[in-house]
Amino acid sequence: MRVMGVDPGLTRCGLSVIESGQGRKVIALDVDVVRTPADEQLHRRLLIISDTVEHWMDTHRPDVIAIERVFANHNANTAMGTAQAGGVIALAAAKRDIDVHFHTPSEVKAAVTGNGRADKAQVTEMVTRILALQAKPTPADAADALALAICHCWRAPMIARMAAAEAMAAEARRKYQAKLKAARA
């Protein structure tokens, strides 16, 4: 499975692509950070992000996009910009019929470090080890994008099993309701 990990942001947007192997083996294929000027108009900054992300999707052909889920932090403007960047990325994926999954920061940290409260340095260190990189990915947005992709690769089998179980439960519920309806008639 090829996963594109995205750490959305208006000033810096981390992008990565990794390929999953057998078991928990993952291989980094590409990583970068899109930067937009803070003094540029919002719609132009989003366009820069959109154009770059679309190029990455067309070049790398990911099977799925893993995006960090935005949460309200102390700065509402930062959260808003991050959410807008994430929306542009999700839209680009939808146009290409690529599945999108959102993961919380604590989910990602727990997946790669074993600790949902790990700091940036711990995440970067573990990403470097897991992917057997020669150098630590910088800035932190690059490491976070790789961590998101790793998290999704490792969680994908569980996500698929949960979806299958939910589908089975929905089918069983539908059959049961049809049986009840027939019994009442």
Curated annotation (Swiss-Prot):
Top-rank lineage group of the source organism: Bacteria
This protein's GO CC annotations: cytoplasm; Holliday junction resolvase complex
Cofactor binding summary note: Binds 2 Mg(2+) ion per subunit.
Keywords, alphabetical: Cytoplasm, DNA damage, DNA recombination, DNA repair, DNA-binding, Endonuclease, Hydrolase, Magnesium, Metal-binding, Nuclease
EC number, as in UniProt: 3.1.21.10
Cell compartment(s), UniProt: Cytoplasm
Active site residues per record: D7, E68, D141
Main location: cytoplasm
Example of a GO MF term: magnesium ion binding
Amino acids binding Mg(2+) 1: D7, D141
Binding site for Mg(2+) 2: E68
Top enzyme category: hydrolase
Cofactors demanded by this protein: Mg(2+)
UniProt xrefs under Gene3D superfamilies: Ribonuclease H-like superfamily/Ribonuclease H (3.30.420.10)
Any one Gene Ontology BP term: DNA repair
Catalytic activity of the protein: Endonucleolytic cleavage at a junction such as a reciprocal single-stranded crossover between two homologous DNA duplexes (Holliday junction)
Subunit structure: Homodimer which binds Holliday junction (HJ) DNA. The HJ becomes 2-fold symmetrical on binding to RuvC with unstacked arms; it has a different conformation from HJ DNA in complex with RuvA. In the full resolvosome a probable DNA-RuvA(4)-RuvB(12)-RuvC(2) complex forms which resolves the HJ.
Record family assignment: Belongs to the RuvC family.
Role noted for this protein: The RuvA-RuvB-RuvC complex processes Holliday junction (HJ) DNA during genetic recombination and DNA repair. Endonuclease that resolves HJ intermediates. Cleaves cruciform DNA by making single-stranded nicks across the HJ at symmetrical positions within the homologous arms, yielding a 5'-phosphate and a 3'-hydroxyl group; requires a central core of homology in the junction. The consensus cleavage sequence is 5'-(A/T)TT(C/G)-3'. Cleavage occurs on the 3'-side of the TT dinucleotide at the point of strand exchange.
PANTHER family hit by this protein: CROSSOVER JUNCTION ENDODEOXYRIBONUCLEASE RUVC
Protein's name according to its UniProt entry: Crossover junction endodeoxyribonuclease RuvC
Organism annotation: Mycobacterium sp. (strain KMS)
Gene name linked to the record: ruvC
